[in-house]
Amino acid sequence: ESALGVQLFSRTARGVTLTAEGSVLYDYAAQALSLLEAGEERIAQSRELLKGELSIGVSSTLTKYYLLPFLRDYHQQYPHIHVRILNGTSRRVLQLLGSGQVELAFATYTPDADSFSVFPCFDTHTVFVAAPDYPCDFDRVYTLQEISEFPLILLEREASSRRFREDCFLQRGLRLQPEIELASHNLLISLARIGLGVAGVTEELSLSGLNRGVVRKLHLAEEIPSRRVVLCTRRNTPPSAAAGRFMEMIRANHGFDRPAEQDG
C-alpha cells in the first residue's frame, strides 16, 4: 500500500475486504499467477514430451532414403510432438538452422565450426549407373575422362552433391556437361533405367535400384572421394527436449557422443 500510495484493504472489526483499487490489483495478480502456472505446466509437458515441436532442415532425398524410419519411430513414441520438416539443399538448411527456423539440420558438407556443432552420421559414395542393357561394358574399368564423355544424367547445379562431383572432375581437368539435369535424386535412377544415359548418383541412396538390378554400376579406375552426412545444431544453444530426444535416436544408430573435430 505504501509503495502504491493507495489503500488496498478496508479493515474493520469484522475483518478485511478489498477496496476498489485492491480489487483492480487482485484481478491483475490473479491473471499473472494463472499465466505463470500455465507456463510451468507447458514447460513440464515439454520436458515430458507431452507437447512441443521438433523442427528439422533436411533435403528431400535424405528425408526419403534416411530419415523416414527415425521419423516413424519418433512419432510412435511421442505422438503429441508436432514434427515440422523444411526441405532444401545443404546450404539452405544450414541457413535455416543459423537463423533459428529449425533446431536440427542434416547436411552433406561440413559447415562453419564456429557457428554449429557437427555430429557425423554416415559416409556416402558417388557411383555412375546405367540400365543393364545400356551400350557400355560393365566388366570394363572406365577412367573419369571416359565417364565424362557419356550422356550424363545429373542433379541440378544447385545441389551440393552436383557441385561436389563437378569439383572432383575439374580437379582433374575434366568438365561435366550433362545431357539431363534433374531436381530429384529418385528420378536419376528412373531415367537411367530406361536407357537415357549414365547417371551420377549416391550409392547409399540408390541401393534399392542396384539391389533389384534395374541399374548397374560402372567400374571406375579412380574412386571419387566420399562425402559425410552430418547432423548440425547451433553451437552454445541447448536443444529442446523434443530435439534432444530425436538426437538420442540418431546417436543410438550411429554411436556419436560428441561433435566431430573440425579441420584447421
Describe the residue ranges of each PLM region.
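Alpha-helical linker/hinge and terminal dimerization helices associated
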Residues: 3-4, 25-47, 257
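Short amphipathic alpha-helical coupling segments at ligand-binding clamshell hinges
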Residues: 21, 25-28, 66, 70, ...
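Central regulatory/effector-binding core of bacterial HTH transcription factors
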Residues: 51-114, 182-184
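A late-sequence structural motif
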Residues: 66, 129, 216-259
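Flexible hinge/capping segments at coil-to-helix
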Residues: 113-152
